[in-house]
Structures are given as structure tokens and as C-alpha cells.
Amino acid sequence: MDTPVIPALGGKGYNLVQLTRGGFRVPEGFIVKASAFDDSAASCSLIQKAEDCSGSIDDKCALINSVMDSTPVSDSLRSAIETVLNQLKMNPSLPSPLLAVRSSGVTEDLDEASFAGMNDTILNVPTDVDSVCDAVKACWRSLYGKRSILYRQENGFSPYNTSIAVVVQVMVPSECSGVLFTADAQTGSRGEISLDGVQGLGEALVSGQVNTDHWTVRKPYGSRPMRVTETRAGRQEYKLVSNYPKPGTTRVELSEEEANRLSFTPEQVMTVCKTACGIEEYYGKPMDIEFCFYQNTLYIVQARPITSLFNVPDELNPLKNRSHPVWSPWVCLSDCCLPMY
């Protein structure tokens, strides 16, 4: 994968742009480039103050939060966000009037270390500029949470001299959500897809709050079609749904019948698995994919290379040497664009 632009967009943002350009359905939105954080951090000498602090990591985290809380979003960034929000509001076909604001660290989703889940995601954010700016700042602050700092130290990255972009997307009110691996991370098999799903929003799945349904799907090969080889029900006791018009999510208890219902129909399983094979071919490597369905429409909300697989020799790897789209100076998620400031 072409990595030079990852420092501009963060791993998550870069992958979402690549997915969009590959023709995969990604929720509309825009990206606040990492340089916006860099400018804000420089304006208040944030990194220097963190490195000069002689206290514990907890002391450094408290200092960083205090400095960032007192540093407003710049007028130029606020104006750019307001402009693109107005573009979003003009689209009558959006699935939701709310936004998901997601951290996109510059060391996130790299081939050698994923950093997945280290930084914050803010859900159900209203589309006014004040709410979005507050959510962007919350993502910036999460870069310096204790867990994130320690993870960077343990993986050989600078704990304080780092950066972050922020992805702002339309919030899809997911009826069911899932995580899919296009290879078996335990056995290394490239011939199977591992799929886990839940009813409602995917945050219940990725945080491990509920039992998941599981499918193992054999990939097509030659004349052999794609086929489900294992289905295991997880019995989900509750689901998370949007708390609209208020921020946040609500826990909804499921009836006995609902709890025992599989999160995806057979048709949805085939749809997402076929799409996942296309994403894997597009990237040229096995992928970890997050997705959801709304009104039976599939949305890809994230994709990243699987970092824990052993290497396959090039001559045995049919995914080797795939081409990728040329980068342009615009950050585009569907029809909504924000210039790279």
C-alpha cells in the first residue's frame, strides 16, 4: 500500500478514502487532516509541555488535557468544517441527521501495528459546527490517553510527538453490524472468511459487550462457489441503538425471540462476504473489515490489513502486486469533500 499520505489522513481516514475510490459504499463525510491537530498543538506548545513535565504519565495526561481544553479550534478550521457541514445537510438521501466522529491516528492501521481502538469515537453528534468542533477536540485529546501513550511506547513509537486526523461521517442507524476477517487469524488460512455480527450498532460488538453470532464462510475457488460452512448463534440479550435526538446510544433489551434471532439473513452474509473478497483483492492482502446494514443496504465503515498473519511466498500469493488509485489533493468521502488544509 502507498503509505506517504497516511501521515496526512491517519490510517482510518486513508483506508476510507481508498475504499470510496474503489467503489465500495462508505458513509459520506470528510476528514480533518492531521496538520490541523499539529497547528493546534504548536499554538499552545503542547508536545514541548508534555515532554518537559517531570511527573508520572497520569500527571502528563492531566496537563495535556488541561492545555487542550483551553485551546480553541482555529477560526480557519472552524470555517472549513462549517462549509462542508452545509454541503452534507443539502443531501436529502442521507440515512441519518447525525454524525460519527472518529479518531484516525497517523500510526493507526499500519501493517506492522494496528493501534485499533486506542483513540475515541464520538457517536450521534449533531450537525452544528459547535458540536462537531467539540467532538474533534475530544478525538484529539484521546491521542494522549494513558492507554494510547503506553501502547505507543511499547510498540517503538514516540509517546508524545505524534499526530492525529479525525474522520467525520454520517451516522448510519445500523440495524445489524459486524466484523469480518478475510483470513483466519488463528490458522493463517486464506481460504476462509470469519464473520461475527450483532443486532444494532457495532459498538456493542467491538467493545465485547454482547455475545455475537458467528459464521465461517469458504471462499470461492475456481468452479467451487462461496459457501457457509459454520453458523453459530450467540444469543444477544440487548442491542445498542441511536439515542437520537439526544447524543449517545441507548441499550434496548431484546425479547426471547429477538435474542435468539441471527443478526444477518443468509442473503446479507453472502453480500458482505462477496464485498469483502472484492476489498481483499483491491488491497492485495487479507483484511479486517467493519460494516453494517441499514434498510438492507451494506455500508463499509472501516477496513484495515490484518497484522497478525504469517507471510505467504509471493509466488503462492494471488493478491500480490495489485495496483492502487492515484492520490489527489482532495480528501473525499463520497460526494462530500474537504480540501487538505
Please place each PLM-identified region on the residue numbering:
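N-terminal beta-alpha lobe that positions the nucleotide/phosphoryl donor
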Residues: 1-167, 176, 259-267, 272-284, ...
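Conserved functional hotspots at enzyme active or ligand-binding sites that engage polyanionic ligands
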Residues: 171
